[in-house]
Design a protein with these regions (language model features):
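Surface-exposed binding/hinge segments that line
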Residues: 130-192, 219-222
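Extracellular/periplasmic solute-recognition and catalytic clefts
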Residues: 216-228, 257-331
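Long beta-strand-rich cores associated with HINT superfamily self-processing modules
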Residues: 543, 603-644
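Extracytoplasmic/peripheral linker and loop segments enriched in polar/acidic and small residues
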Residues: 342, 388, 441-449, 468-508, ...
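N-terminal lobe/hinge region of extracytoplasmic solute-binding protein
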Residues: 38-89, 119, 208
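Structural transition elements
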Residues: 346, 360-403, 417-422
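Gly/Pro-rich hinge or "lid" segments in bacterial periplasmic/extracellular proteins
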Residues: 170-171, 176-257, 267, 632-644
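Periplasmic-binding protein-like
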Residues: 331-374, 423-424, 586-595
Length: 644
């Protein structure tokens, strides 16, 4: 088995089965450190437009993708793939010139890559939470309302490396620059995303990236499974052959490889962090992994660290832009009543739920700390104030339920079965059952959780048995579940007669627990998706009467929709934020979403590494480009050396 010198990122993060003994060789080519990074959950899709939906996804995607603009560590918008930009007030256009950087396969990033990627997101058939961030582009919104075509959208390549964007009238172009700094709007490769539409984002051979790292290898769902990211040697280096490894390492990206592993228990992670070579050989609880050299020590622990972890008291914390939340299906007969939703919120002790993780804070609003109000240094959360109680009020919850005319009922709480979600779900179940409700828990793996969160067209449903995820009529797919090729089956789908009238659409869940990720340090990206017309959901363009869809909660408030419309048309961030304060207040009165706690990035670092404090981006994720190991930079696994 391979050994890797270690910087070890856990709690998101887990220690691998790859730490048993073989020697180390000096890397005379000075490629840089091999860094072991231990995360507790894998990324299901490497499509940034679809997968920027929780703190773990942000960690992965921000390592491998870069947008036209980007945020620095303080949340300020700076140039990303853009080299220069110029705004012409008369023509209302922004012209971007791209810098000399390339995809991970060596092909230089072009203006056409942005035209394709942004039109792909804006296509009415495509679902993406970030879609409304592009609505400042001329005819982008009209396209999704059925009054324009893709050809009408204000995106054009002037030449290979120059992109022209025509904006809607009255738009502050600086707000658009802030929006396109989101990782969700990073470009993807048309020759892979269009040809291998259903599989490219899950195959390491088809994932071509624009950022500091690229996907070298993925071993998903297997014993000792791991993900290997390697320095993108073409990042800022289109003349790769003329620049030495040493310059690329020192100037752009210090580590050569990041190795993410997904196997061992929290206790074993603690053992590895505390391990020293003088302790001799130590076997971990899996009975196979041994620690027997200095390189086996965990040097870096980060992520959603459980409060019960033995190392918790030593952790440092940084805020993330994610809020653990509950989405309620307002089309459910019970949850359609605002009084029921209010009762469910009042019954929860947010302080107790937050205490499960180091650094997590009770959410008294949906918009997280770290989101600005006007200036970058200002706080939306501070201006908006506390909208929800941090502690439970069972008496008020029972009163709200009674006022809604409800004394009993059954609800299913669905969640992704990772980290400590089960513990959170169990606490929620116990709180709600004190109200006289019956709560069923439904833990799912990533694939089937995504299915539950997808819209269903009545008459064309996929019928899936929740216990075995199969039905009566089998069809083979390329889907891999739990690391093995699995037959996923579908019931016959009714052929809908297109009479020009859009069929009923719905979501097949009661309540889902998820990590709600803010896409930019702006409250608009948090709140806009709950408004009809800004949800980003695909629309059924095959029907004459197609119209924008609601958020997956089914929430549709004319008053809320109007507030988001006003915010969209605001001319600066402060004016927009003032309107969004009112929007958040209304949203959390109606409560289609119940915020629980704001996640934190809790981490520890040993003296063997440096640069870790410079590597945390505005999302609270580690960029790793500046992290180095002074004692281990020139070491690589012996098996790697022998293969060179």
């Amino acid at each position: 088995m391979k050994r890797f010198t270690a910087i070890l990122l856990t709690a998101l993060m887990l220690l691998s089965a790859g730490l048993c003994g073989c020697g180390l060789f000096v890397d005379t080519e000075t490629k840089g450190a091999y860094i072991n990074v231990y995360m507790g959950s894998e990324l299901r899709s490497w499509d940034p437009a679809k997968s920027l939906n929780d703190a773990s996804a942000v960690q992965y995607l921000s390592l491998c993708y870069e947008s036209m603009m980007k945020y620095d560590e303080n949340g300020k918008v700076v140039k990303g793939i853009c080299d220069t930009y110029e705004y012409d007030e008369e023509t209302n256009t922004l012209v971007f010139t791209l810098r000399k950087t390339a995809w991970s396969d060596g092909r230089r990033i072009s203006a056409d890559d942005f035209v394709y990627s942004w039109k792909r997101i804006l296509n009415p058939d495509f679902s993406c939470d970030a879609k409304s961030l592009l609505y400042y582009i001329k005819n982008a919104r009209a396209l999704n309302e059925g009054t324009a075509t893709l050809a009408d959208v204000g995106l054009a390549s002037i030449d290979t490396y120059t992109l022209e964007v025509t904006l809607e009238q009255g738009i502050n172009y600086e707000l658009f620059l802030e929006n396109i700094a989101s990782i969700a709007l990073a470009p993807v490769r048309e020759d892979y995303a269009s040809v291998y539409e259903d599989t490219w984002d899950r195959s390491s051979t088809n994932i071509i990236t624009s950022g500091a790292f690229t996907v070298k290898n993925m071993e998903s769902g297997k014993e000792g499974q791991r993900l290997v990211l390697e320095r993108n040697k073409y990042y800022n280096c289109i003349n790769y052959d003329s620049i030495s490894e040493e310059i690329r390492r020192d100037k752009y990206v210090k580590p050569f490889r990041l190795i993410f592993n997904f196997s061992l228990s929290e206790d074993d992670r603690t053992t590895a962090y505390n391990y020293r070579a003088k302790d001799g050989e130590v076997t971990l609880s899996d009975g196979k992994t041994t620690l027997n050299e200095a390189a086996d020590q965990l040097h870096y622990i980060s992520g959603s660290l459980a409060s019960t972890n033995a190392l918790a008291s030593k952790a440092k914390t940084d805020s993330t832009l994610s809020t653990m939340s509950l989405f309620l299906n307002t089309k459910n007969a019970l949850l359609a009543k605002q009084g029921v939703r209010q009762a469910l919120s009042l019954a929860l002790d947010r302080e107790a739920l937050a205490s499960v993780y180091v650094g997590a804070k009770a959410a008294t609003g949906l918009v997280p700390n770290g989101v600005s109000y006007g200036k970058v240094s200002s706080s939306f959360r501070k201006e908006a104030g506390d909208l929800l109680p941090a502690n439970a009020d069972l008496s008020a919850a029972k009163s709200a339920l009674s006022s809604a005319g409800v004394s009993s009922g059954t609800l299913t709480l669905t969640y992704r079965d990772t980290a400590h979600n089960g513990e959170i779900a169990q606490s929620i179940k116990e709180a709600w059952e004190q109200l006289g409700l019956k709560i069923k828990l439904n833990p799912l793996d990533a694939a089937h959780f995504a299915h539950v969160c997808s819209i269903v067209e009545k008459g064309n449903e996929e019928y899936i048995d929740p216990t075995v995820y199969t039905t009566t009529e089998e069809v083979t797919t390329a889907e891999a579940v739990n690391g093995e090729d699995t037959v996923v089956t579908k019931a016959p789908m009714k052929e809908l007669f297109n009479n020009g009238k859009q069929p009923e659409m719905y979501y097949n869940y009661d309540i889902v627990l998820l990590d709600y990720q803010t896409l930019t340090p702006s409250a608009f990206s948090t709140l806009a998706p709950f408004a009809v017309g800004f949800s980003g959901n695909a629309v059924a363009t095959d029907y004459d009467d197609y119209a924008p869809r609601t958020h997956m909660t089914g929430y549709n408030s004319e008053e809320y929709n109007a507030l988001i419309e006003q915010a969209f048309k605001a001319n600066d961030r402060a004016e927009m934020s003032k309107i969004l304060v009112d929007a958040e207040k209304l949203l959390l009165t109606d409560l289609p979403v119940i915020p629980l706690f704001q996640n934190a990035n809790a981490y520890l670092a040993s003296s063997a590494i440096s640069g870790e404090t410079k590597s945390i981006n505005v999302y609270g994720a580690h960029s790793f480009t500046k992290v180095s190991q002074s004692k281990f930079d020139n070491y690589i696994p012996s098996e790697e050396k022998e293969s060179q």
